[in-house]
């Protein structure tokens, strides 16, 4: 999308895009080229040793730039969420794998009634140019496990392209950013935490088809085995918390857990596909370019 860029500043509510990054100086121009005009961009730098911050300031002069307080994607997102002031928060990656041009579709899903707009590479026309056979198999298994335990209908649990209303941050309840000591939730498991906790709260989740591209420059920090095990451990923690119905402390040994909310999850898909959950509400949303530009 090198021509017309959608201007979301002309609409309400206000939109903040949070972008965690570390050593992504070469990729940021591609991200900026496809970024719609939004009310606020929050750049979270993870101690980059290249020109990431300099390039970000040049591309987005008005961006809020913060340094994350620990390591890991989860901590970076928590720092970005804390700095965000928009009504809607959109989380994307800085490596070019998530397409900023899709942001209007996520925002539209929220303004049409969703609490969480969940990107999906495996339904509603979504696709991935990057996922390996091992990651696809692991994602499918983790999807099935979460859907059975929490009575949800996720098609793509581990994809990090999401948008949600900022008012739901207390439900997500990520670890505090005030300490430098490592916390459970600081890593790639953050995406599972967000999805499961919002589902457990009985909020409306709409899946939006998304195209994942290959990283443009550099190498991914994702490790399919170790990060997959962290996600599996997160699912078990949330399952135990659901049974106990109580909140634990934020620490590596005892993760922060939300209180249990007795409500059925509503997982809706924008294309009207079956979710596999009998009580789930299916919402159809028009995500054509003309519609999302309105």
Residue locations for each model-derived region?
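Hydrophobic helical membrane-anchoring modules
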Residues: 1-12, 178-294
């Amino acid at each position: 999308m090198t021509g017309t860029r959608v201007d979301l500043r002309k609409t309400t509510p206000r939109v903040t895009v949070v972008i965690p990054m570390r050593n992504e100086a070469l990729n940021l121009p591609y991200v900026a080229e496809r970024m719609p005009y939004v009310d606020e961009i929050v750049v979270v730098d993870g101690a980059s040793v290249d020109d990431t911050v300099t390039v970000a300031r040049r591309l987005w002069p008005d961006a809020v730039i913060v340094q994350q307080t620990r390591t890991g994607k989860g901590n970076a997102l928590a720092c970005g969420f804390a700095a965000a002031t928009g009504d809607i928060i959109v989380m994307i990656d800085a490596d070019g794998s998530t397409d900023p041009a899709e942001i209007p579709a996520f925002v539209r899903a929220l303004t049409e009634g969703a609490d969480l707009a969940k990107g999906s590479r495996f339904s509603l026309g979504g696709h991935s140019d990057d996922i390996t056979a091992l990651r696809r198999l692991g994602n499918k298994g983790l999807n099935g496990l979460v859907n059975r335990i929490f009575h949800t209908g996720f098609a793509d649990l581990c994809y990090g392209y999401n948008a949600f209303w900022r008012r739901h941050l207390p439900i997500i309840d990520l670890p505090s950013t005030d300490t430098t000591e490592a916390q459970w939730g600081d890593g790639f498991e953050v995406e599972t935490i967000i999805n499961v906790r919002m589902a457990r709260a009985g909020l409306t989740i709409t899946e939006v088809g998304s195209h994942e591209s290959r990283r443009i420059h550099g190498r991914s920090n994702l490790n399919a085995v170790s990060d997959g095990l962290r996600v599996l451990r997160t699912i078990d923690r949330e399952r135990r918390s659901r049974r106990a119905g109580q909140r634990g402390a934020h620490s590596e040994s005892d993760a922060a857990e939300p209180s249990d909310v007795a409500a059925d999850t509503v997982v809706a898909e924008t294309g009207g596909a079956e979710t596999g959950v009998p009580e789930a509400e299916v919402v159809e949303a028009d995500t054509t370019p003309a519609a999302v530009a309105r």
